[in-house]
Amino acid sequence: MSVKVASPFSPDGVQCLPKLFTISAPAGAGKTTLVHMLQEEFPSAFEKTVSSTTRSPRPGEVHGVDYVFMSEDEFKDVLDKDGFLEWVFLFGTYYGTSKEGISRILQKGKHCIAVIDVQGALTLKKQMQTVAIFIQAPSQEELERRLNTRDSEKDLQKKERLEHSNVEIAAASQFDYVVVNDDLTTAYQVLRSIFIAEEHRMSHG
């Protein structure tokens, strides 16, 4: 039996089937902040699946909240057991999206948000029905400025991420929606409107 979710955007409580939304962006584009804002406003309707990674936690990151931090052996063990819906090796680090994590959220009747890299989002889009959203900084210069505020990353890591961002931005046309994060408040309203439009489409067939 399918579990439905009551739309937080509809005054008459129209219900629809929960759906998987993927949100991707170059490092520094602001995807984490935007997703946090969405969860804060609509905690009963949306839940973010927690990705697994073999990188070390950054200052302020919490295991099980921001990421499931694993050793390489632990990650490969889950991989061998076919526990990831998608995974990628990027910048010397493994990242993966848990099958169980997504399934658990959808079965609770909540929309699932997966904050994953571009390659992972496009992989999921081929495997199942998703709404793929790409967050983009207004310019490469602004992206570089935001990355330079991250004390947790070394210069080489920042350079690699900037170079990789060109590949990610080139793939933006393959996503269902592109949101330019020039102003955080405006970008959030655009993101919010995407969820409203998708819920309306799902509830009205």
Curated annotation (Swiss-Prot):
Keyword vocabulary terms for this entry: ATP-binding, Cytoplasm, Kinase, Nucleotide-binding, Transferase
Transmembrane segments: none
InterPro entries xrefs: GK/Ca_channel_bsu, Guanylate_kin-like_dom, Guanylate_kinase, Guanylate_kinase_CS, P-loop_NTPase
Gene Ontology CC entries for this record: cytosol
Molecular function, one GO term: guanylate kinase activity
UniProt-annotated binding residues for ATP: A25, P26, A27, G28, A29, G30, K31, T32
Domain Guanylate kinase-like: 18-196
Main location: cytoplasm
Record-listed E.C. numbers: 2.7.4.8
Reactions catalysed: GMP + ATP = GDP + ADP
UniProt superkingdom: Bacteria
Protein's cellular compartments: Cytoplasm
Alphabetical list of SMART domains matching this protein: GuKc
Entry keyword Coiled coil: no
Cross-referenced PANTHER family: GUANYLATE KINASE, GUANYLATE KINASE-RELATED
Record's function text: Essential for recycling GMP and indirectly, cGMP.
Family: Belongs to the guanylate kinase family.
Protein name: Guanylate kinase
Organism (species): Chlamydia muridarum (strain MoPn / Nigg)
